[in-house]
Design a protein with these regions (language model features):
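Short secondary-structure boundary segments
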Residues: 1, 35-46, 78-93
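N-terminal leader segment of winged-helix/HTH proteins
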Residues: 1-8
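Short, contiguous alpha-helical
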Residues: 8-12, 16, 22, 29-72, ...
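Short amphipathic alpha-helix starts
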Residues: 21-22, 95
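Glycine-rich, flexible loop/turn motifs
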Residues: 26-28, 70, 103, 107
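Acidic/histidine-rich alpha-helical segments that form the ligand environment
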Residues: 76-113, 120-134
Length: 166
């Protein structure tokens, strides 16, 4: 199985789990709360990963023209679970479409404009984006549990889900 297929499946799996985390918030108010010592709410984390993937996968790799508002991702303090889920679903659609149409050999190419002084290998950058998404998914899950007292996991499916035919 190709690296591209595995990375695509991982990103989609983590985004699906993030949507479940947002939906598991009992109300829209919890979505924007933080615990002491925590800077970002579940809502901010959701908007951030959605914007991050729309920008880097959709725009930088796929040429979508998406214009990112990173400041809004971290400064928004209200909104509905449905709105955050819609942003995550839109990012999921972009990831799915962009990576499904990406030729495998493009993974060996480089991406410019991410860092000011160097080009990044696309395959390595996609792995980084998966780790970044998983990191924030873990933060969102832990924060939701702390704020609600609900210890129910919304985590991604086991690795076998990445190996099965989509």
């Amino acid at each position: 199985m190709s690296t591209l297929i595995l990375v695509r499946r991982q990103l989609l799996r983590e985004l699906d789990a993030f949507i479940r985390e947002v939906e598991a918030c009992p109300d829209d108010e919890v979505l924007w709360k933080v615990a002491p010592g925590v800077t970002n709410s579940v809502g901010n984390l959701g908007l951030h990963v959605a914007g991050n993937l729309q920008h880097f996968v959709g725009h930088m790799i796929g040429g979508s023209g998406y214009v990112r508002d990173r400041e809004r991702e971290f400064n928004q303090r209200s909104g509905s679970r449905a709105e955050v889920c819609a942003a995550l679903r839109a990012a999921r659609d972009v990831v799915d479409t962009t990576l499904a149409g990406l030729p495998e050999e493009r993974l060996n190419g480089h991406l410019t404009g991410v860092l000011p002084d160097r080009a990044l290998p696309i395959d390595a950058f996609l792995v980084h984006l998966g780790a970044h998404l998983a990191f924030h998914l873990g933060q969102a899950g832990y924060l939701r549990r702390v704020l609600t007292g609900d210890n129910t996991s919304q985590s991604p499916l086991p690795i076998i889900a990445m190996l099965e035919t989509a």
